[in-house]
Amino acid sequence: MGMQVRIVLYAGTRDEARQAARAAFEEIARLDWIFSDYRDDSELSRLVLRAGQAPVPVSQELYEVLDRGQRLARQTGGAFDITAGALTRLWRGAIRDERMPNEAELRSAMHVSGTDKLRLDDTAQTAQIIGAGLRLDLGAIAKGYVIDQALTTLRAHDVTKALVEAGGDIVVGAAPPGEAGWHLTIPHAGCEVVLAEAAISTSGDTEQFVEIEGIRYSHTVDPRTGFGLTHRRIATVVVSDGFTADGLATALTLVEDVEMEALLDLYPRTRALVGYPRLPEGPLGPDYYLRVYDEASTQNGSNTPGLFAGCRR
């Protein structure tokens, strides 16, 4: 899936730690074979090759991720779209080559994208891609699923105090010895949060973007327009699992400001921190104005109100 993974754990013995870590990395490798769009032999790639054909039986893991992706698409009015892989690839190339995709390229990529072109059957556990050319991109949701499963594997080996990180997404188990939780930094907010049995994910255009004719385009594509995002925003989500955190963090960079609270209300006990850069940038990069979404979490009984209290506004 084109990502580095880091595991930190506490175990009774060195051998126990080694065995648990090996099992977790083996699980990650197994899931990479399912979800990767970089591998021609992955289950995802083989599904795409059968576009335009009959429904295809898929693994439980792939079905769960596809189903969650389609649900987020509905909840965001199509702003989050796992079927927009052709657009994602087009803008990857645009960033690499520092050029604007031409109208024909954009039109072609949008034509083969669309959630209506992916049909799922929960009873038969099948997926069907309608028409040729569609590419699935699970990069904004599968990472969270993978690190959740890695943490579950560690727990199965009696390792409960652990952290798993992949591409900026983090899940943590029980707190390290002598600590209230894992101390995690949110760089754009200038603060630290302390978490246990939780997940945190950050999404935004802080690193991957291209500037063309004075306009900055993000690597995150709005499938409704076909263009990389031009509004600058970085979102951090804290919730109980990485699967939810990963997808929601990306979704919050895509939806309109007025839609954020309604989206978060669909996920009880979720907290979010959304940053907007103050311009012009200073020599050390942007300073962010922060919007905190913590009220809904408190109302739903969260035991950690004020999680972002130390973050600058």
Q: Where in the sequence are the language-model features?
A:
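Mature catalytic core of soluble alpha/beta enzymes
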Residues: 1-313
